[in-house]
UniProtKB/Swiss-Prot annotation:
Belongs to the HAK/KUP transporter (TC 2.A.72) family. It comes from the Bacteria. This is Probable potassium transport system protein Kup. It is found in: Cell inner membrane. The chain crosses the membrane at residues 62-82, 104-124, 153-173, 195-215, 222-242, 255-275, 300-320, 332-352, 390-410, 419-439, 450-470, 472-492. Residues 1-12 have a biased composition (Basic and acidic residues). InterPro entries: K+_transporter, K_trans_C, K_trans_N, Kup. PANTHER family: LOW AFFINITY POTASSIUM TRANSPORT SYSTEM PROTEIN KUP, OSMOTIC STRESS POTASSIUM TRANSPORTER. Keywords: Cell inner membrane, Cell membrane, Ion transport, Membrane, Potassium, Potassium transport, Symport, Transmembrane, Transmembrane helix, Transport.
Length: 675
């Protein structure tokens, strides 16, 4: 007996670019698991990369690591933030007045206090997802506690929008950071101004070229360099404050309020530059899973915040004493003899800041792949002992190309600042919206408390975002364009994969029917172990049906394996896989991975031996299906989105590579699917 075959086209056994789909909606899987548990036929095992969400101690080593990775972006903002703000109220004929400079210094300080200290360090960092932070973790928390499918979709869209803006930020950060650092050449050697752009491009090319080596070894030096950087910031700030000690009065919010009231619309424009002082605040939350709350909080409160405040106030004091210092107040705080060493230190600091954004993009992209929002791509591990240290070649060179184009197009850090703020404030808004849901539904805050606390921050974030919307014609369109394009790509991929899964469900044979007919089958059984990968554990994989059609045989031992992507950072320890016996020598295996984990299917399956289910990695053969997608007569996707989806599908990495299956153990069949 051979079960009926669905329509197909172009059967082949090769290594195509994309393999079996991995489900994103786990409803069917969970139902299968719970049913199996109730029948007493399941076993749960470990097997895979495990992690821990427990709080980490805030020792000196942890604090150094935090300074080297987390605070690079926000720590290099003094290079350009205050200069950009004061430039708005200054002109060659009418330099900024002391009260205006004090007002902007006060606005900068209170932006650091409200957005970074209170919103992120005190509040948002409480909302961890099994120890992990970041907007993806926050989105997963919000979706988990929401019963309405409509709101789940809405919160997913908010999370994806914030994520896409982060990608835009990751392109702009290396460009503006490196540019602002090398612009110091013009201060110490004015005749060398013509080499600023070429030098910035050389630094950027070098930065992205060494990504393939990983940050394991050089990362150990990041912490001490940033300790030196923040110490120098504080020392320079104190030096500047002695020029005009009254600048410390700007710690009072009355100066900020006075500036807003007296300047009206101009103060609204200035807020678009003030927000540059808090770029990188999202990194505190995103890196919480790597370092824990305590080291990040202590480093901010006792070292980073004081250093930044002193430097901003020192620059402001210098500008009050010498309005002509507006050309570059940061470097003009530095004694002439130390400007070249400071240029070198600033370049190192900006490279570290850029490195943090690039590494964060790699990690975020991996999470999105696991959640099904992006196609699989080649992921390289740069450190055999550190699972989190990864390199994505395709993403790396997309970021590099974008950063180089921005340097050539904008040419100065002050011009590029217009493109920077809107990505940062957009991410702030998305995080605030998701936090409202999490603090109300997860932490059980009263509705009134949530409305007052996060309503206030939503208003603050909205004001900053609106101020940056004014910059759209001057460069603010860049991160918006990147965000819109990224959102279209992610939603198109998600939609396309769901259409494929629905079509496979409609065309496939139920697993129960296959098992019921198997005892009466005359199909020849051959020695060996066959692993059939399937996105849906309730249906017979197309790869098995094609194997029956072409080879007329079944193996003695069969495993139907489904890889389930969880909406949590890691699978629970001891709950990596669930095994259910369907028939003699036929088992269903569901292997689960969180969005922070890298799948390793052969490693997980080796653990089956402990439960009496024989698995020999040398003898196992893996059978997968490759979808040959075409447009149906009644298409469910617009033509332009279909083109995008097919392009992504053609360039996606294979299942073999993504699940780390040995290529020489794989047999793959092509299946034609119309959507």
């Amino acid at each position: 007996m051979e079960p009926a075959m669905p329509e197909h086209d172009g059967d082949h056994a090769s290594n195509p670019p994309h393999g079996v789909g991995i489900p994103n909606d786990s409803a069917g899987i969970v139902q299968t698991i719970e049913q199996a548990r109730s029948e007493g036929h399941t076993h749960e095992i470990g097997g895979g990369e495990e992690g821990s969400g427990h709080e980490r101690p805030a020792g000196m080593g942890a604090l150094l690591a935090v300074l080297g990775v987390v605070y690079g972006d926000i720590g290099t903002s003094p290079l350009y933030a205050l200069q950009s703000s004061v430039s708005i109220v200054s002109s060659p004929k009418a330099p900024a007045q002391p009260w205006e400079i004090m007002g902007l210094a006060s606005l900068t300080f209170w932006a650091l206090m409200l957005i970074v200290t209170i919103k992120y360090v005190i509040l948002i960092m409480r909302a961890d997802h099994d120890g992990e932070g970041g907007i993806i973790a926050l989105m997963s928390l919000a979706q988990r506690v929401c019963k309405s499918q409509h709101f789940r979709w809405l919160f997913g869209l908010v999370g994806i929008a914030g994520t896409c803006l982060f990608f835009g930020d990751s392109i702009i950060t290396p460009a503006i950071s490196v540019l602002s650092a090398v612009e110091g050449i013009e201060t110490s050697v004015p005749s060398a101004s013509h080499i600023i752009i070429p030098l910035a491009m050389v630094v950027l090319v070098a930065l992205f070229s060494v990504q393939v080596l990983g940050t394991g070894k050089i990362g150990k030096a990041f912490g001490p360099i940033m300790v030196c950087w923040f110490s120098v910031l504080a020392i320079l700030g104190i030096k500047g404050i002695f020029l005009y000690p009254h600048i410390l009065l700007a710690l009072s919010p009355t100066f900020a309020l006075e500036f807003i009231v007296l300047h009206g619309y101009l103060s609204f424009i200035a807020l678009g530059s003030v927000v540059l002082s808090v770029t990188g605040a999202e990194a505190l939350y995103a890196d919480m899973g790597h370092f824990g709350r305590a080291p990040i909080r202590k480093a901010w409160l006792f070292f980073v915040l004081p250093s930044l405040t002193l430097n901003y106030f020192g620059q402001a004091a210098l500008l009050i004493r010498d309005p002509h210092a507006l050309s570059n107040p940061f470097y003009l705080l530095v004694p002439h003899w130390a400007q070249i060493p400071m240029l070198v230190l600033a370049t190192f600091a900006t490279v570290i800041a850029s490195q943090a954004g690039i590494s964060g993009s790699f990690s975020l992209c991996r999470q999105l792949i696991q959640l099904g929002y992006l196609p699989r791509t080649r992921i390289m591990h740069t450190n055999a002992s550190e699972e989190a240290q990864i390199y994505l070649p395709s993403l790396n060179w997309i970021l590099a190309f974008g950063a180089l184009v921005l340097v050539l197009a904008f040419r100065t850090s002050s011009a590029l600042a217009a493109a920077y703020g809107i990505a940062v404030t957009g991410t702030f808004l998305c995080t605030c919206v998701l936090a409202m849901v999490v603090f109300r539904r997860v932490f059980k805050w009263k509705s009134a408390t949530v409305a007052i606390v996060f309503g206030f921050f939503f208003i603050v974030d909205s004001i900053f975002f609106s101020a940056n919307v004014l910059k759209i014609p001057d460069g603010g369109w860049v991160p918006l364009a990147i965000g819109i394009i990224s959102t279209i790509i992610m939603t198109t991929w998600k939609r396309g994969r769901s259409l494929i899964a629905a079509r496979q469900q409609a065309d496939s044979m139920p697993m129960g029917s296959f098992l019921a007919r198997l005892p009466q089958s005359r199909t020849i059984r051959v020695p060996g172990l066959a692993v059939f990968l399937t996105a849906n554990p309730d249906i017979v994989p197309n790869s098995l049906l094609h194997n029956l059609k072409h080879n007329k045989v079944l193996h003695d031992h069969i495993l139907f394996v489904t890889v389930e992507n969880l909406d949590q950072p890691e699978a629970e320890r001891g709950h990596r896989a669930i095994v259910q016996e369907l028939a003699p020598n036929i088992h269903r295996v569901i292997v689960r991975y969180g969005f922070m984990e890298m799948p390793n299917l052969p490693r997980a399956l080796l653990e089956l031996n402990a439960l009496g289910v024989a698995f020999d990695a040398i003898q196992a053969s893996y059978f997968t299906s490759h979808e040959l997608v075409v447009r149906s007569r009644v298409p469910k996707m617009q033509l332009w989105r279909m083109w995008i989806f097919l392009f992504l599908l053609r360039n996606a990495a294979s299942t073999t590579e993504f699940l780390r299956i040995p290529p020489d153990r794989v047999v793959e069949f092509g299946v034609r699917i119309a959507i």
